[in-house]
Structures are given as C-alpha cells and as structure tokens.
Amino acid sequence: MKLTCMMIVAVLFLTAWIFITADNSRNGIENLPRMRRHEMKNPKASKLNKRGCREGGEFCGTLYEERCCSGWCFFVCV
C-alpha cells in the first residue's frame, strides 16, 4: 500500500516536472525568468562561466591557460 502510494506520487511529480520544463515552441524564451532569459541571449553573462577563472595579474602557469578569465596566460593572466 505504501509502495503504491509512493509510486503514484513519483509518477505525478515526474509528469509535472516534464510539463514545467518542456519547450514551448510558440513562445520560445519568453516564459523563462528574467535572469535566465538574459543569460540565454548572452551566454558570457552567466556567472557559471566565470567560476574558477583567474583575474588579470594572477599566476596561471602556461600559455592559453583556460583558468584565466581572458583566456590568455604568460605565467600571469593577461
């Protein structure tokens, strides 16, 4: 009985999740929250893209190090 109830709740939750996250081809990006819409129009504006990168003047190591925010490295981030 408990297992059946848990399965029903899980199926309802997953069904609701699918409808919430489904793409609406007519409205496109209009239904997304403002911040997410801005990040989709300009992916470089996302805070996640800058996570772990080093600012200019910090030690990085080798040329073209991906850890630099600018992407350029010559012992220090440029």
Swiss-Prot record:
Primary location: secreted
Secretion signal, residue range per the UniProt entry: 1-22
Family to which the UniProt record says this protein belongs: Belongs to the conotoxin O1 superfamily.
Tissue: Expressed by the venom duct.
Domains as described in the record: The presence of a 'disulfide through disulfide knot' structurally defines this protein as a knottin. The cysteine framework is VI/VII (C-C-CC-C-C).
Disulfide bond sites: C53-C69, C60-C73, C68-C77
Subcellular location: Secreted
A cellular component annotation (GO) from this entry: extracellular region
GO MF term set: ion channel inhibitor activity; toxin activity
Protein name: Conotoxin 6
Propeptide residue interval(s): 23-51
Top-rank taxon, per record: Eukaryota
UniProt keyword annotation of Secreted present: yes
UniProt source species: Conus imperialis (Imperial cone)
Keywords: Cleavage on pair of basic residues, Disulfide bond, Knottin, Secreted, Signal, Toxin
Keyword Secreted: yes
Pfam families the UniProt entry points to: Conotoxin (PF02950)
